[in-house]
């Protein structure tokens, strides 16, 4: 009966979302309607599963508040200037990423940067949807009470599910269709409206779970682990961790920010928006730490990072931490996986939009057709990634699954190269007047920080990205 209720709740949620979007006007190219819509939608593109399963772990491992300080410095030196680069290209072009680079470069081959971003985001969406589908399954399992058990049970549950040839595929396709249902309805009536709903909900869930976690006996050890400034832990690896997190957390190198900026109004302050988005992204990551570590330390569990943290470690933590209050543990587990699904959805929407906008504008087809093509391509990648996790052996080679190879190619090659080319283009090749006009909104804003921005883009950002690239390959 519980499973039937959970299934009905899931179907009901999809129907609510459908009718929420059904009467919206279908527009080929629109724009964000409000300032808060700009910030929430673009911040949603940056906020994702990495904020929850990587940043808190790095913070605790690398010196707590000391790591956060170093991370903030890299965000301002690399992340924010990199974001502004894509904002400048996107808003000036007012079109998909490839065409935006084409326009700003005067018809030169820089359009390849935008096309590369579309390729990168499509591959990422393919394998990201797999993990997002796992979030859906675990949300269902939480509702149905299927995650109650000891550590071995939780581990076995994940292994059996992730290697199943059918269930993960269905979950992946379901999440892609959920993403599709938002993107197909356009910018203002789809992406913006849903982001305005999802992001506040995400914040609320984070706060509720974090407060409950911090109130557990022994939670102070987790808070200390996360925030105590331990400068003795600062070393080369700490700096590289902070630099890499600042780069990957803000979706640089995927043309996502460029695509969203094409929907910005001419009155949007690009620099201010970049700072606000970076602050929101960091705050969510810190709240995620407050949600995870106090609960983990309260039961003596050493938290790790990545999928194993959220799909194996945390179910066990919830079961132990709230053993005397099983109803509370049930609710916390349910809220946590709802939060994960929402965080994943805000990211998949933006990745889907990159390819959708390029397809319907360049092929001169409707947004609906472009969205279906993008969904279909990502579905093929997603199914292959899902099956490579254990169901089909030939999809793994050289010690890596197809999913791992997709992650490797995008994270270690395409994203750093794309971000580097974007910075080089804005810093050295784009018309100076256009860049200055976009930064200052054609002189209506003060250009106090323009010189600092240009210096970072020309020198600091390329050096940082080269360091990230070399570190990814184990050279440094």
Question: What residue spans do the PLM features occupy?
Answer:
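Membrane-interface "cap" regions at the ends of multi-pass membrane proteins
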Residues: 17-53, 82-87, 91-104, 108-115, ...
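Helix-loop-helix connectors at the membrane interface of multi-pass transporters/channels
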Residues: 25, 132-163, 263-267, 272, ...
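Extracellular loop-to-transmembrane helix junctions
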Residues: 12, 59-85, 167-168, 414-418
């Amino acid at each position: 009966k519980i499973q039937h209720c959970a299934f009905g709740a899931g179907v009901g949620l999809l129907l609510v979302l459908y009718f929420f979007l059904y009467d919206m006007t279908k527009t080929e190219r629109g724009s964000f309607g409000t300032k808060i819509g700009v910030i929430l939608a673009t911040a949603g593109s940056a906020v994702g599963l990495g904020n929850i399963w990587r940043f808190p772990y790095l913070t605790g491992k690398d010196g707590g508040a000391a790591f956060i300080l170093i991370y903030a410095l890299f965000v301002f030196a690399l992340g924010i200037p990199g974001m502004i680069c894509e904002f400048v290209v996107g808003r000036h072009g007012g079109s998909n990423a490839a065409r935006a680079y084409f326009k700003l470069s005067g018809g030169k081959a820089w359009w390849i940067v935008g096309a590369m971003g579309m390729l990168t985001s499509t591959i990422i969406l393919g394998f990201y949807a797999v993990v997002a589908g796992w979030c859906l399954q675990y949300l269902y399992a939480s509702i149905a009470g299927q995650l109650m058990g000891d550590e071995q049970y939780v581990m076995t549950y994940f292994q059996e599910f992730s290697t199943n040839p059918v269930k993960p595929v269905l979950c992946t396709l379901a999440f892609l269709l959920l993403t599709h249902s938002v993107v197909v309805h356009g910018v203002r009536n789809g992406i913006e409206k849903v982001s305005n709903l999802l992001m506040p909900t995400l914040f609320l869930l984070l706060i509720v779970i974090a407060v409950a976690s911090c109130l557990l006996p022994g939670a102070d050890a987790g808070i200390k682990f996360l925030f105590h400034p331990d400068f003795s832990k600062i070393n080369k690896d700490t700096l590289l961790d902070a630099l890499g997190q600042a780069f990957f957390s803000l979706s640089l190198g995927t043309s996502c920010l460029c695509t969203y900026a094409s929907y910005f109004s001419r009155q949007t302050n690009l620099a201010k928006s970049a700072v606000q988005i970076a602050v929101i992204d960091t705050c969510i990551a810190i709240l995620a730490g407050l949600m995870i570590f106090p609960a983990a330390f309260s039961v003596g569990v050493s938290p790790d990072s990545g999928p194993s943290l959220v799909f194996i470690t945390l179910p066990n933590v919830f079961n132990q931490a709230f053993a005397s209050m099983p109803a509370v543990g049930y609710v916390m587990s349910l809220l946590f996986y709802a939060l994960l699904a929402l965080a994943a959805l805000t990211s998949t929407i933006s990745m889907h939009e990159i390819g959708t906008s390029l397809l319907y504008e360049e092929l001169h087809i409707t947004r609906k057709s472009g969205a279906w093509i993008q969904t279909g391509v990502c579905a093929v990648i997603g199914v292959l990634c899902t099956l490579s996790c254990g169901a089909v052996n030939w999809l793994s080679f050289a010690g890596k699954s197809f999913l791992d190879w997709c992650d490797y190619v995008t994270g270690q090659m395409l994203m750093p190269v794309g971000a580097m080319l974007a910075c080089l283009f804005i810093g050295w090749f784009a018309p100076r007047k256009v860049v200055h006009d976009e930064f200052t909104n054609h002189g209506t804003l003060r250009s106090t920080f323009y010189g600092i921005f240009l210096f970072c883009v020309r020198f600091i950002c390329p050096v940082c990205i080269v360091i990230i690239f070399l570190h990814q390959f184990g050279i440094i």
